[in-house]
Design a protein with these regions (language model features):
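P-loop NTP-binding site
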Residues: 1-94
Length: 94
């Protein structure tokens, strides 16, 4: 199962990494682009339990793709982890 999200606010690096690590064991991979507070736009890659960030060109809005190891069952833990870390509903699409 592959899911997508867009987001239109800068995020804190520590918050984004904590969110990704909370769901890492249920994902094959996650990749996207976020505006990181204090760092600007970053390409974000999650493989296993490793989160890598590297500078990238500015985007219109943040976006991320999640590739699930557990099929559609990823939706509930993914949205719950986002709510816990960011304090708002996750703008998830499938």
């Amino acid at each position: 199962k592959t899911l997508f999200m867009n987001y239109d606010k800068p995020v804190e690096e520590q918050t984004l990494c904590a969110f990704l690590l909370d769901v890492a064991d249920s994902l094959l991979r996650a990749k996207g682009f976020f505006e990181i507070a204090g760092k600007g736009w970053q390409q974000v890659d999650l493989v296993g339990r490793r989160v890598d960030l590297k500078p990238c060109e500015p985007k219109e809005k943040a976006e991320m793709v999640f590739i699930s190891k557990i099929g559609p069952a990823i939706i509930r833990p993914l949205t719950a982890a986002w709510q816990q870390h960011f304090g708002e509903p996750m703008p998830l699409k499938n």
